[in-house]
Amino acid sequence: HIKAETSDQDMIFMGNDGGSEITALTLDMSAAGNATFNGSIFSGGNVVVPNGNGIDFSATGDGSGMTSELLDDYEEGDWTPDIRQSGTAVSDAAYNTSFTAGQYTKIGRLVQMTCSIRLTDKGTVTASNGFQIGGLPFTSTNNVKARSAVSLYNHLGAGIDMTGNTNGTLMGLLSHNADEITFRVEDFSGTTGEAVLYEDVGDTLYLQLAFSFITG
């Protein structure tokens, strides 16, 4: 091993580049000292960051509303959406598993998600219960500014019956402090709308969704 015997003195790795003396690496020998490299760091393996730490971008310029400059998380994976009425999963709903799946990527607090969900039987219906899609691996942050619109495709003839609803557009919303998507039909003027009920859902529902949101 390499050991510095002199108290409170840095260890400096120096060299000669074309006749010029350069400092390649400085090791601060204090208890919480840093290693400072003169140039880029190249790794043949993974860079492992302890929990609670990350990449600090405080050297960059800031927006007026900046609250953090630490990139402390990255994750990607799969998730499985489920059908809910009034917040409860429909236990006897049957899914076409070949078309019921999702993927996500989480960078910091931002989560980007896609999924498709397809039924073969929607199961037991309770009148006037709202319709939701759940199963999200993360909950949105508890801040009304973080509500997220959902981009969706309702497959014709295998989706949601809107004949009894306000004439307009089917919309999805992930509210704040939520782990499920709710659905509404808004009229074209944007002045009225109503929630989609589970009784409006077809037995062969087939939806595809894409959305992003901020976690807590």
Question: Residue ranges of each PLM-predicted region?
Answer:
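Short acidic, glycine-rich loop/turn motifs
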Residues: 4, 15-17, 59, 83-89, ...
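Short, exposed beta-strand/loop patches in secreted or surface proteins that constitute
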Residues: 47-48, 101-105, 169-176
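Extracellular attachment/recognition segments
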Residues: 138-186
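Residue-level detector of buried hydrophobic side-chain packing
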Residues: 27, 111-115, 136, 211
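Glycine-rich, low-complexity segments
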Residues: 32-92, 141-145, 208-216
